[in-house]
Amino acid sequence: MLFRSEADLSHYRQELKAPREGARGLSSYPHPWLMPDFWQFPTGSMGIGPISAIYHARFMRYLTHRNLLDCQGRKVWGVFGDGEMDEPESMSALTLASRERLDNLVWVVNCNLQRLDGPVRGNGRIIDELEKLFRGAGWHVIKLIWGSDWDGLFARDSENALLKAFANTVDGQMQTFAAKDGRFNRENFFGQNAALSQLAQGLTDEQIDRLKRGGHDLVKIHAAYAAAAAHRGQPTVILAHTKKGYGMGQAGQGKMTTHSQKKLDESALLAFRDRFQLPLSDAQATELAFLKPSEDTPEIRYLHTRRQSLGGYLPQRQTQCDTLPVPDLTHYASFALQPEGKEMSTTMAFVRLLGQLLKDPVLGPRVVPIVADEARTFGMANLFKQVGIYSSVGQQYEPEDIGSVLSYREAMDGQILEEGISEAGAIASWTAAATSYSVHGLAMLPFYIYYSMFGFQRVGDAIWAAADQRARGFLLGATSGRTTLGGEGLQHQDGSSHLVAATIPNCKAYDPGFAGELAVILDRGMREMLIEQQDVFYYITVMNENHAQADVPASVHADLLKGCYRFAAPPSRVKAKAPTVTLMGSGAILGEVIKAAALLADEGIAAEVLSVTSWSELARDGMASDKEALEGGVVSTPFIHQMLANSQGPVIAATDYVRAV
């Protein structure tokens, strides 16, 4: 574990400057790329954290039920904001959590009642709203509303005047109370009627100002957390009432501008010091000196004791885990490498490859097939009986097709994650599996297969978040092919997913035209992730159209992985000094490129064909060469330049994707 030092803290948001001064710095947001030994999860974008927490808790159950890892006793804690609950992803999977009885999941929703621009519910009450939503979805709700300072007032309130006043106070007004001092709150809250005024008698303005909301009371926080940890049979949410900018006083507590507060002036710093009774001199306070108790103080000894009792220090992140052997390519992919001209689609070829990998005694149990209600579309129904569909309660019914070899079989140790019509849920499951090597120290190999149009274009933000978490796995954009999918309707015809994939640095995107190419790419990806433990994931488009498959000999594998290889020289029937042209094609269009070469040969034009497996990998290689030139070092020749070095005529590239790819 690499701890962060005071030198790192003093270089907050100065990671470039820090190494020159013997430090590493501290990123402004938790991020596994900026601090790979420290942060497990990134914090953006809003809404992705909540749904990820739910599916991660479910994935832990999956690991336990499949006897891969005992996750009993472990919990997923998610800390979110009340404003974040407006994101659709935040609330979209609440019923899955209750349906799966995920009592290993606890959410803490910080209800400070404020968004960046203003109140979350100025004319309403967000805590009441969230309570109804969570209870209706089957969650256990713990309301952490008022601190211990209020207990005596509630005890003396025989007329329930406080409860009535709170019930009639909308959040916009509650924010105003948070921003004002004790005198204002005495006059405007307790001054509403005689019963409230009587309750406030004997309290000074300062005491009224110090009345805590529940989310700032350590005793109440402990009670809420203990209750959440002990609850069984349901997921739990703690709705914690707080003040934004707590303790900042007039400088920022409860202010509309609190979020954009960049720094405090000297008077505000001294007021903050006094408010929390910090043992700092005026000079130390205004110079922002760190306050750290010495190692032999009761506080520090207590913290070390608790962390040791709880199993270690947090945050921390594992970067490596045990390697996982990958079977030899010929053991499971001979049908693809040497298909002898058989016709099949690359989507079907992938399903066959997946089925073979699932049978491997070592790698097979770590494979996680994920679908969002399209398994039958992709020809995966044969896997239902082979490995089963995961269900936390097994199968308590007799499926209609029980006599079929494609019968819908659910089981507690089922391997397929069938997520229904929820691409957001499927990608959350994929992320949980793809980061298991780091979070759980257990390498898993997820394959999420979906209609290619409903991946990056549908859940691109979640895929970016997975990339931030240094995910390892495969995304399969299936039944791709803009020109070959016209019958499905325009909304299914993907011409842009590879463009989006190319924007993610640790995503390698391929558009293979043949099953053998696909097999070679899968093999390389598995070795890169499971043996070399590189933090990359692959996006591969696989086609819907059946066509004759070509052999992919070992001699072209290296070039294929770089992005293209020489598929066919000009036909021998073309005259030696005939005009020449180089044709390049990928994926669904490669077959048309091959046909075009034959037509050109009939016209006396010599056309060689390059099969392009990845436009983005070719582009990245070229950009790497440009970078070398800018840095003044040894400049390597881009691979595409090498491939086209002997081309004599025009070069024509064809793809099913937008030209920017």
State the predicted function of each range:
Residues 18-42, 48, 62, 66-73, ...:
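Thiamine diphosphate
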Residues 39-42, 69-87, 105-106, 367, ...:
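A short, small-residue-rich loop immediately preceding and capping a beta-strand
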Residues 80-83, 115, 119-122, 372, ...:
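Conserved short loop/turn motifs at secondary-structure junctions
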